[in-house]
């Protein structure tokens, strides 16, 4: 999401990386288990969601033994661990729309945690559907900028069936329709290897520029707290930090 990559860069420098990595692995494993359980097959060739989950796991270097364990767990009939997919929507301060996607084994616990986080940082949790009209629901695939030229990647995206690409100084970001996401991801993975990131998400139609340091820090803290939950898979918002505010926050110890 707009502003989100900058936030992740800031946290990469500040955060306790082992702890963060463990949480990322937990989220990936939940998606693998859910995909394997809910799909028509445990074979990724016949289960697009599982195939996509495995690609995402490999992009984050989730060890193969943990991937295999997650799939075996999903196949175990005695395993009663099931996760429910829920989308929470609300507003952060200053009218910033936030979408929170979760996989949870306890809906009441997660709802209370998400609501508490919104309230604590000056936001308000709304009904499902209250802000999603401000976003485009689509597939997102990201490669480092040096994987190929913008023209070459664009040609590959068109051939694969994607519908847009935006390239900046560091990243090629490819957008796809949801129904084409798995096909485009498989095509690009075959051509360029495992992407840096790939997911179906909510991309803002327009962004609100945050040009005040205090407002930015409060917003980023809300996003950080939400993302710290093992239940939360991803957080999306329609904001972007101004260059000045981003540089100030990035420079803080």
Swiss-Prot record:
Pfam short name (any one): Transcrip_reg
Protein name from the UniProt record: Probable transcriptional regulatory protein RAF_ORF0717
SUPFAM superfamilies per UniProt: YebC-like
Family of this protein: Belongs to the TACO1 family.
NCBIfam families the record matches: PRK00110.1 (NF001030), PRK12378.1 (NF009044), YebC/PmpR family DNA-binding transcriptional regulator (TIGR01033)
Keywords from the UniProt entry: Cytoplasm, DNA-binding, Transcription, Transcription regulation
Intrachain S-S bonds: none
Residue ranges, annotated region (Disordered): 1-21
GO-annotated cellular components: cytoplasm
Subcellular location: Cytoplasm
Any one GO biological process: regulation of DNA-templated transcription
């Amino acid at each position: 999401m707009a502003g989100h990559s900058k936030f992740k860069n800031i946290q990469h420098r500040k955060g306790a990386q082992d702890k963060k990595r463990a949480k990322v692995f937990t989220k990936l494993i939940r998606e693998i288990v859910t995909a394997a359980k809910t799909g028509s097959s445990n074979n990724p060739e016949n289960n697009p969601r599982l195939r996509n989950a495995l690609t995402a796991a490999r992009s984050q270097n989730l060890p193969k033994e943990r991937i295999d364990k997650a799939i075996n767990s999903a196949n175990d009939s005695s395993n009663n661990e099931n996760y429910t997919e829920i989308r929470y929507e609300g507003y952060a301060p200053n009218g910033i729309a936030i979408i929170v996607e979760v996989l949870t084994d306890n809906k009441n616990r997660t709802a209370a945690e998400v609501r508490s986080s919104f309230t604590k940082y000056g936001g308000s949790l709304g009904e499902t559907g209250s802000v999603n009209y401000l976003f485009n629901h689509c597939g997102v695939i990201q490669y480092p900028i040096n994987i190929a030229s913008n023209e070459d990647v664009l040609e590959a995206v068109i051939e694969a069936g994607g519908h847009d690409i935006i390239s900046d100084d560091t990243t090629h970001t490819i957008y796809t329709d949801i129904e084409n996401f798995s096909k485009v991801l498989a095509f690009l993975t075959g051509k360029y290897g495992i992407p840096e990131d790939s997911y179906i998400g909510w991309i803002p139609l327009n962004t609100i520029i945050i040009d005040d340091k205090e407002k930015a820090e409060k917003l980023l803290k809300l996003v950080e707290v939400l993302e710290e939950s093992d239940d939360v898979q991803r957080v999306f918002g329609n904001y972007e930090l101004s260059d000045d505010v981003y540089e100030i926050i990035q420079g803080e110890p």
